[in-house]
Design a protein with these regions (language model features):
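Short amphipathic alpha-helix adjacent to the substrate-entry channel of hydrolases
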Residues: 99-123
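Primarily recognizes the serine-hydrolase "nucleophile elbow" in alpha/beta-hydrolase
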Residues: 154-220
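N-terminal secretory signal peptides
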Residues: 1-23
């Protein structure tokens, strides 16, 4: 059963063509800008305001071989001591695996999880090196295929199971771009116990790179998903949330969608002006509850 709390918000239209882009990529960039990335503040380093100590944790940068034999870089952290630990895959925003994402992994490790954040854009460039969000979207994000992302996440899950993670307790959380991936992975991997999607896009145009969106996959979900959204996020209109809720309810899927009335997009991102401490803290608590209620 799906539950949702929401309030009406006004949608915003963006028309930001990128000269010279092939149509499929142009559609993707327009969709992405309309999904709130145009409002994103490009971080200098993604330096998290919240600084989580690594005392009592083991952490480091690792490489995980993908299905195409590319060694994908990832940040890994878990409690010191003997496992196996439940694993949470952490899926980045469009800005990559910067310090905020790493700190989020450490926060999870302090709760007893093994956390892994793979660099899912690695094959296409460094997000932090792009001069504008628009160029980041067209030159990197538009080149990333959902199929490759899902395959890379599978590789991370396999690595985790062989390196201190409990193969029977796998979860995932994602932010912004990664929030959409959270819904997709819950429809893709039957071994996933639970997922939490933070303000992930629910609708979009179909393309070879992104053939399906969460609203298309409500019936296909194989794991319970918690969606956390901002009531003042101009990028994800209430109609999209309602459509997702309706699809989940019709399919009889176990899911919950929470909308924070005064929050905008990226309300958990503590390095950005959009950060809302109270809502972020509440969402974090709900996420941990969701994981534990579903065997993680």
């Amino acid at each position: 059963m799906c539950k949702v709390n929401w309030m009406l918000v006004e949608d915003s239209d963006f028309d930001c063509p990128v000269p010279g882009l092939p149509l499929s990529r142009q559609v993707f960039v327009n969709d992405a800008l309309a999904a709130g990335y145009a409002l994103a503040v490009r971080p200098r380093s993604g330096q998290s305001v919240i600084q989580t100590s690594s005392d009592g944790l083991v952490a480091g940068d690792i490489h995980i071989r993908g299905s195409d034999k590319v060694a994908v870089r990832a940040y890994w952290v878990q409690p010191a001591g003997k496992g196996p630990f439940p694993t949470v895959l952490v899926v980045q925003e469009i800005f990559g695996v910067h310090e905020y994402i790493r700190d989020t992994c450490r926060r999870l490790a302090r709760q007893g999880y093994q956390a892994i954040a793979p660099n899912l854009f690695q094959r296409h460039g460094d997000p932090m090196g792009m001069p504008t969000v628009q160029e980041l979207m067209s030159d990197i994000v538009a080149e990333v295929a959902d199929a490759q992302v899902l395959s890379d996440l599978d590789a991370c899950a396999a690595w985790a199971a062989a390196n201190g993670g409990d193969p029977g307790r796998l979860g995932l959380t994602g932010f912004c771009w990664g929030g959409r991936i959270a819904w997709l992975y819950a429809a893709y991997n039957p071994r996933l116990k639970a997922a939490v999607a933070w303000y992930g896009r629910l609708k979009g145009s179909s393309s070879p790179m992104t053939p399906h969106h969460p609203v298309d996959l409500a019936r296909a979900l194989q794991a319970p998903v918690l969606g956390l959204y901002g009531g003042k996020d101009p990028s994800i209109p209430v109609e999209d949330v309602e459509a997702m809720r309706g699809g989940l309810a019709e399919a009889g899927k176990r899911a919950e969608i929470v909308v924070y009335p005064e929050a905008g997009h990226a309300f958990h991102a503590d390095y950005r002006p959009s950060f809302r401490a109270v809502d972020a803290s509440n969402g974090w608590g709900r996420m941990l509850e969701w994981f534990r209620a579903n065997g993680l």
